[in-house]
Amino acid sequence: VGESHDARLMAPMDAVRVAKSDPDSIIGIKVRIGRIASGPSGIDPLVIALQVADATGLPLMCHIDQPPPSYEAVVDMLRPGDVLTHCFRPFPNSPLNGDGSVKDAVLAARARGVMFDIGHGKGSFAWDTARGMIAQGFPPDVISSDIHQLNINGPVYDQVTTLSKFLPLGMSLPEIIRASTEVPAKAVRRADLGTLQ
């Protein structure tokens, strides 16, 4: 059972209090949405998390897994500077239409400043999705791993392996490095990080 299955267990007032009490450590608000993570609560935990992000002035990161809710419903709610992780996930709930084109809601989200993060985990990254997105001029903003005990021995292994997967997909080495250093630092409003300058 995902942590957001029962919205009564979410504690938005406590989250705001804790975030404000330690601004050097708490850099954003994260919520997990999808059939596995939020189940019968659907998209409601995202509504609550957005309110917490607004109250704290922090960016929001949203995990997406299998539907419901749909990819479109999730990205439609995200604001400029918010981050969608597991963005190149496979069907169902891929950012691609059945014909392989990028969904209009995904294009609109990027145009308004939503950031797209790989969050490569065990089942949250698909080569076909990544190939289709990048071929259509939609590379990820952030390349990160979602490494844990179930994927450290594959398919993730480590961050360097995750980064290397984007070379054969057509991203340049400087683009890949920026997506793993400079861009995520800016996403968490710490532009002083992620650079040797």
Regions picked out by a protein language model, each given a short descriptive name:
Residues 17-18, 75, 196-197:
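Short secondary-structure boundary/capping segments
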Residues 31-132, 136-153:
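Active-site core of metal-dependent hydrolases
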Residues 1-33:
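Divalent-metal coordination cores built from histidine and acidic residues
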